[in-house]
Amino acid sequence: ELPNYLFRSWIDFQLAGGDHITEYRNKWGDRNYKVSDTNRQLIADWYRGKCFLYDNRTVEGDEKESLLAITENVILQYGVDVILLDNLMTALDLEQGTAFDKYDRQSLFVKKLSRIALKYNVLILLVAHKRKNNFTANENDEISGSGDISNLATITIAYEKGKDLHPGQRLLKVSKNRLFGKTETKG
């Protein structure tokens, strides 16, 4: 969902960290933040050849190919070992399949993603949003869509504001962990 023109700004802030971000006022007096030109260049040099962005909005309808095929090709062509797909609903828009409803399509897509991850020994992060107005205590059941999304995942992580946190803080919770078994870990 992140527009390609915001990607560099977003990732630069994440990589720079709070110690390398400065505050300034724009011509209207609003408070803004920036990474210095020197640090932006250092960051750009570091991630050059490491980050590849695919924006489906820039591809003509008849040129689109399966996102799964694109993912596999990028792994093979560039040696990528971490893939971030934001988000499941957008990814499904790129998949033409024979599945009848959206839950079947979600299940099939996640199964195929899981196979790609295992086949090439890569990490695939799939963003899936929470259900609206869901009140279950199980984080995995709060994922919007097919139950196969969390069933097939090796790890599920919830990201939220948290009621008792400072406004600038967020909560990460591991609710499923097939690698190490620890869940309900907060950080």
Regions found by a protein language model. Name each.
Residues 104, 108-187:
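Phosphate-binding/switch region of NTP-binding enzymes
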Residues 2-99:
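Conserved inter-motif catalytic segment of the P-loop NTP-binding fold
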Residues 1-3, 130-131:
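Short beta-alpha junction loops
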